[in-house]
């Protein structure tokens, strides 16, 4: 099916491009989400009349994403999870967990904006890419640790492997609450 793109889509094209995609992709995703129009004469004329509005809206969204990116780029977030002695997590850190942590910090991020190449299954520092807009990508660091104390050590030492961090945390005496 030939479609006219109403916004920039990765690996597909820019605003106004006429591209050919599979029928299901167009019918089930691009057309219902308002990201494209069928490429017929009426829609081509409609697009040409609306082109300036669409480009202005895209520029506005891009500027908004860049403002968020300036505040969020390079920031780090702490995730506390239980893990074994080798640093292997009991489970994994998913895009839902990352979305919740970033949202608790006051940012509005959707799960589909997070790009995880592989699930996070070990403690340590993990870079994660956020796609705020098709033209705006940033990187944040996820600190996965067993406790807040261990996360603080990871931030201070950033070079420590998960096993070394484990040894340091185990060597420190536990603070007892004497009431």
UniProtKB/Swiss-Prot annotation:
- One annotated GO molecular function: rRNA binding
Give the highest taxon in the source lineage: Bacteria
Any idea which UniProt keywords this protein has?
Ribonucleoprotein, Ribosomal protein, RNA-binding, rRNA-binding
Span-the-membrane segments of this chain are none
- InterPro entries in UniProt: Ribosomal_bL9 (IPR000244), Ribosomal_bL9/RNase_H1_N (IPR009027), Ribosomal_bL9_bac/chp (IPR020594), Ribosomal_bL9_C (IPR020069), Ribosomal_bL9_C_sf (IPR036791), Ribosomal_bL9_N (IPR020070), Ribosomal_bL9_N_sf (IPR036935)
State the GO CC annotations.
ribonucleoprotein complex; ribosome
Q: Name one GO biological process term.
A: translation
Recorded hits in PANTHER family, A to Z, give: 50S RIBOSOMAL PROTEIN L9
- Report the sequence similarity comment from the record: Belongs to the bacterial ribosomal protein bL9 family.
Relate the protein's function as given in its record.
Answer: Binds to the 23S rRNA.
Which named protein is this? Answer: Large ribosomal subunit protein bL9
Q: What gene name is given for the protein in this entry?
A: rplI
């Amino acid at each position: 099916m030939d479609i006219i793109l109403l916004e920039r889509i990765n690996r597909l094209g820019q605003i106004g491009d006429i591209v050919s995609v599979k029928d299901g992709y167009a019918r089930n995703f691009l057309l219902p989400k308002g990201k494209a129009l069928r490429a017929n004469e009426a829609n081509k004329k409609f697009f040409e009349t609306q082109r300036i509005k669409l480009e202005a809206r895209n520029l506005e969204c891009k500027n908004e994403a860049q403002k968020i990116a300036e505040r969020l780029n390079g920031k780090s977030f702490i995730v506390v999870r239980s893990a074994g002695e080798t640093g292997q997590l009991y489970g994994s850190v998913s895009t839902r967990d990352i979305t919740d942590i970033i949202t608790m910090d006051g940012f509005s991020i959707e799960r589909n904006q997070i790009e995880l190449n592989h699930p996070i299954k070990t403690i340590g520092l993990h870079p994660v890419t956020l796609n705020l807009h098709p033209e705006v990508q940033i990187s944040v660091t996820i600190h996965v640790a067993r406790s807040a104390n261990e996360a603080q050590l990871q931030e201070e030492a950033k070079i420590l492997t998960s096993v070394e961090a484990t040894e340091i945390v185990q060597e420190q005496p536990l603070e007892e609450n004497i009431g």
